Each structure stands twice: as structure tokens, then as C-alpha cells.
Amino acid sequence: IMLVDWSGSMNDVLTDTIKQVINLAQFCNRVQIPYRVFAFTTQYSDLENERSLLNPEQRMKKWQEKKRWYEMKAEREGNYINCSSDKFHLLELFSSKMSLVEFNTMSKRLVDPRFLWNKGYTTGGTPLNESLVWIYEHLGEFIKANNIEKTTFITLTDGEGSSFNTSLGHRGLEDSRNEIVDGQYKRIKQKHFIKDEVTQKTYELTRDSTVQTDVVLRMIKDRYNV
């Protein structure tokens, strides 16, 4: 599986990156290796079109309903990482299930500089960590469906992504909290850990996006041996 960073900072090298991806995909096609290629992005037109149909009051109501749903979930289940951001999308560019005509057509479109000007396909932010979590949750399905013994996971990106949000907001990963002790406010240090229920390994997590990237990559490696 390959992930491609579809962010604005990649604009100068995106065409060359796509060409590299096409070469890798062609190799996989020749030797019949199952593969999928995704672009991760904060931009996609379907959601924007949906938003454009709503007036400001409707958008606010929808946001409040979603916020309340997560608050109720947090009350039931405690603090957890929330990766269901409206600003995270995965676009499947290539796969081993494509026909030769489909593959060649997509290749021509992607290397055309005008492709990025299509509505919904402009580059945006870098939801790197969210895309890694998606891989962590779904890589096993890909391995099982294709009866794969050894998997290679490639990420083509130029920088760090945004930090995770949690059911408690960004404060859910703060390294300290305020409590009243003997009638006085005191700052209490705290640490956060995430546990893989399959490997039973535990990882320390902070608000630092780079640390988060490293943690999820280690979780992917430990669970799937990639």
C-alpha cells in the first residue's frame, strides 16, 4: 500500500512524485503484486458541495449535533482519539484491480498539471496521522483479502501532519491538568498511553504531531510486521 501526500507544500514536487508512484505501480502490475495507492488530503468537493447547500444556521446545527454526539460518546467510553474529521479524505488513485485502460487513463490525468485545478482535487493540508490510523485499522483486511505473506507500506510525504484531536478536544493529550488540592489549584503532571489490543503493546502518546506519527508507524510495524 502506498500513501501520497496531497498537500500544498508538495505542489513543486507532486508531478515527479506521481511519476514515481506510477513506476512503482507498473512494476507491481508486471510481477502481479496486489497494491493500492491513496492520496491523503483535506480537500474534496463532495463535502464542500454538501456544505454549499446549507445555510449558516443549518451548518451550525449540524456541527452542534456532531459535537454533542462525540461528547456523549466520550462520557460513555472516556477519552479517545477522534480521526473522523471533516477535513480528512483518502482518494484511491490506483489499484491492482484496475484494467490497463483505466490505469493508463488515470496516469495521463494525474501527470497533467491541469488536474490539480479540477474542483475538489486541489492540494490542501496534511492529514498524515489520520491516514496512518486508517492504514493501521484496515491493512489487515488488505492482507487477508489478497493472501499476502509479506507487505510493504510506503508513504510519500514532505513533512509533519497536524496533531490528533480527541473526544476531549486537544486538551485530551495535555501533559498536565489543574486540580483543586486542599483548597488550592495545583498543576498535576500526566501521561497518556494507547494500547494495541492485538499485540498487547502500549505506547506513550503526546500532543506533538511528530511523536504521534512515530507511534502510529510503530503500531503498524508491530501489528503487521511491515
Segment roles from a protein language model:
Residues 1-226:
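Acidic, glycine-rich A-domain
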